[in-house]
Amino acid sequence: MPRAQLDKDPHDVAGMFDDVARRYDLTNDVLSLGMDRLWRRATLDALGARPGERVLDLAAGTGTSSADLADDGVDVVSCDFSTGMVAEGKRRRPDLAFVAGDATRLPFADGSFDAVTISFGLRNVSPAVAGLSEMLRVTRPGGRLVVAEFSTPPWAPFEALYGFYLQTFLTPLAKAVSSNPEAYDYLEESIRDWPDQLGVAALLHEAGWRGVGYRNLTGGIVALHRARKIATENTSAGRG
């Protein structure tokens, strides 16, 4: 497979994730030096989902975060564009509801969910605003969104160190543990091309979300973005 480019057909990107599905979680643990689990836990804490609430876990991968939500009594639907990820998730947790779906054309009715979360997947949605608009559509008025995504460390020396890690160590580590190391060339490219914290906040506003805010994790390597759908919003608002 050729080196991943950011303007690739979305189905090609999904195919790359199909290829890495079986060892996806292990690879994430290794490449993040174990931080991936902490970032996902922080995301769920920020979401604050309560037992009985209906939550959409978008770009759910193999369902790692969905499983934690379900174990806490949340009615969670796991949705991913990669059929390989969905199949692997069903194999691991057959009790969870997995759905294959495109974030820009979600297969759910307006106002279906109390909350939506997407972890490390918004970079893969093209265009991102269309995906955020769809997330708004399927969220009930007054509902909330939490996005965890790679971001830009605000302290320049740390940003330089992080960039050195991405360029020097990411691919060799991926080759050691991943079933498709070239997919992690795409990871590096997509991180470098992705907007910073304020840029993502602007995308959220453009899509119709309100109460937008963020906080940095691990020095800004990751940012947690939070937003709400205003209670008086028409459920059709925000369509892309």
Curated annotation (Swiss-Prot):
Q: Name one Pfam family in it.
A: Ubie_methyltran
Entry function: Methyltransferase required for the conversion of demethylmenaquinol (DMKH2) to menaquinol (MKH2).
PROSITE patterns recorded: SAM_MT_UBIE (PS51608), UBIE_1 (PS01183), UBIE_2 (PS01184)
Asked if the record carries the keyword Nucleus, the reply is no
Name the Gene3D superfamilies for this protein. Vaccinia Virus protein VP39
Which GO terms label this protein's molecular function in UniProt?
Answer: demethylmenaquinone methyltransferase activity
Indicate the segments annotated as coiled coil, or none if absent: none
According to UniProt, the name of this protein is Demethylmenaquinone methyltransferase
The alphabetized list of GO BP terms reads: menaquinone biosynthetic process; methylation
Keyword terms, alphabetized:
Menaquinone biosynthesis, Methyltransferase, S-adenosyl-L-methionine, Transferase
Record-stated family:
Belongs to the class I-like SAM-binding methyltransferase superfamily. MenG/UbiE family.
HAMAP family from the entry?
MenG_UbiE_methyltr
Q: Report the EC number(s), separated by commas if there are several.
A: 2.1.1.163
- Binding-site residues for S-adenosyl-L-methionine, renumbered to this chain: 62, 80, 102-103, 119
Record's catalysed reaction(s):
a 2-demethylmenaquinol + S-adenosyl-L-methionine = a menaquinol + S-adenosyl-L-homocysteine + H(+)
Classification via SUPFAM superfamilies: S-adenosyl-L-methionine-dependent methyltransferases
Pathway(s) served: Quinol/quinone metabolism; menaquinone biosynthesis; menaquinol from 1,4-dihydroxy-2-naphthoate: step 2/2
